[in-house]
């Protein structure tokens, strides 16, 4: 009961003080229909952590089978999630945003020729396929030349990643596509309908201070806008999403 992890790391933010996309998410979840108590939050987080423990046990079962069948030295084990969960942080739940609780996920790998260690540069789930292909000796140029992402294998020996991580969102709670660029300590978020967001995750890991309106960060904003425009045609992106529905 005294576990600090049962409490949100960021207290609920009043609806009127939320950013535009978070307001849409709260409206999409019909936030006024529920009176979420502190006990509800703790129970929800406890259940989430219980799920993690359950998955951990099942991964142990898989590794046990690999060891008993003498396949562990010929197997690459990868643990990954496609998204996180806000779990009440900022008063938000589920996924659907670029905040760290939603977008940041674990990525762990073990197998032949993978030395134990850690890698702190931002990477993407898009990097998984190129990484596994290189570890398996497969050239994606021969079989899947259209594949996005970059191999993380150089990172196993300490090579730093220089490419930014790109993210897109155009699902529940969005009235237009959102895009995000994570480049080192910086996170930039853009939607044609909303004010821009810029966070310095080194000094503000909870993403509580949007630096985009601050003239002191005009250089960073200009650089991110150029990256954004080089990568996305936002009008075409919006049209493609609507036509696909």
What are these regions (language model features)?
Residues 1-122, 135-144, 207, 215, ...:
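Active-site-proximal cap/lid insertion segments
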Residues 66-67, 155-156, 212:
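Hydrophobic residues in alpha-helical segments
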Residues 54, 58, 127, 131, ...:
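Charged catalytic carboxylate motif
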Residues 29-40, 128, 211-245:
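Long, internal low-complexity/basic segments
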Residues 83-89, 110, 115, 126-129, ...:
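C-terminal cap/loop subdomain of S1 sulfatases and analogous C-terminal strand-loop tails that border
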């Amino acid at each position: 009961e005294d576990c600090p992890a049962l409490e949100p790391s960021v207290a609920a933010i009043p609806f009127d003080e939320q950013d535009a996309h978070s307001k849409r998410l709260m409206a999409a979840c019909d936030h006024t229909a529920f009176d979420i108590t502190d006990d509800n939050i703790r129970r929800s987080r406890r259940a989430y952590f219980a799920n993690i423990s359950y998955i951990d046990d099942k991964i142990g079962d898989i590794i046990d089978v690999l060891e008993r069948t003498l396949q562990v030295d010929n197997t690459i084990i990868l643990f990954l999630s496609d998204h996180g969960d806000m779990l009440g942080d900022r008063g938000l739940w589920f996924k659907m945003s670029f905040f760290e609780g939603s977008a940041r996920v674990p990525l762990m790998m073990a197998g032949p020729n993978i030395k134990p260690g850690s890698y702190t540069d931002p990477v993407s789930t898009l990097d998984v396929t190129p990484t596994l292909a290189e570890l398996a000796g497969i050239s994606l140029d021969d079989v899947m030349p259209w594949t996005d992402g970059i191999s993380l294998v150089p990172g196993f020996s300490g090579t730093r990643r220089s490419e930014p991580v790109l993210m897109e969102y155009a699902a529940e709670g969005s009235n237009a596509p959102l895009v995000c660029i994570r480049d080192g300590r910086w996170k930039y978020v853009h939607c044609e309908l909303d004010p821009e967001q810029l966070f310095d995750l080194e000094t503000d890991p909870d993403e509580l201070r949007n630096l985009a309106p601050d003239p002191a960060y005009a250089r960073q904003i200009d650089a991110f806008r150029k990256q954004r425009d080089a990568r996305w045609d936002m009008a075409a992106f919006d049209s493609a999403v609507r036509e696909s529905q």
